[in-house]
Amino acid sequence: MCGKCVALCPVGVDSCGLKQAQRAVVNNSLPYDYKFLSTAGHAGAAPQNNDNGVLYFAGCMTHLTPAIIKSMTKIFETAGEKYLFADKDGGVCCGRPLMLAGKTEAAKEVIAKNTQNIMESGCKTVVLSCPICLKVLKEEYNLKGITLLHHTQYINNLIQQKRLVLNKTAESFVFHDPCELGRGCNIYNEPRNVLQSIGQLKKAGKEKKESICCGGSLGSLTLDYNDRIKITQESLNILTCNNPDKIVTACPLCLKTFSDQSSRPVVDIAQTVAENICNGCIKQ
């Protein structure tokens, strides 16, 4: 379900859509049902006025990689952003795992509750660190009047607006295009712009729409663990062919998956940005 087959299919067959539709028919036969996600969380954002600024929707996986949340908090504070957390006390599921498991009705309930929380927050912009959440909110939620941004887009905007100034380092980076961010949301340039403002950006063996999945896909419900590891190792080999100092990604699932197998440092782009903020360079 990484989307590469769809992106490269010469006749445009939506194999991911076909798989998901089939799972909705046979969902009782799947080994995982994600029942623990069927109850929506409560967004921590309380309505205050007509524009509370930015709502940060971290999501389930980002709460398992707290360094991303810590880094985003520093970025918000440095930029002088008015912001609220949608899920400060625990990850709010976007509904995607339920959809992938064929639990369509349960997913609709989660989506309806999250939509209500977002609309009642008073925020006009939602920033997400998880590209899986971003894709679902774009495609499945009715959020009229709300701007949805992945944190790479948001950070890139801050840099262009000179609300965030970064130090230049001698480090070299390679960027891994997460499946849902690249092939799913067509976001390729913003993360590269951000990294080039910090250090040297090296090329991977396969990039953009040809990028290899990290191996941690939520959609591969029956894939053997050893097969997942093979995918992860293949992706790491492709990413490190030009010997970068660090592997940078922009998805909490990719970060967690790569970090477990890589001998080289793996970080989220928000961490790289937060570590290289030029203190005292921004005039508030």
What positions do the PLM features span?
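Iron-sulfur cluster-binding electron-transfer modules in prokaryotic oxidoreductases
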Residues: 4-284
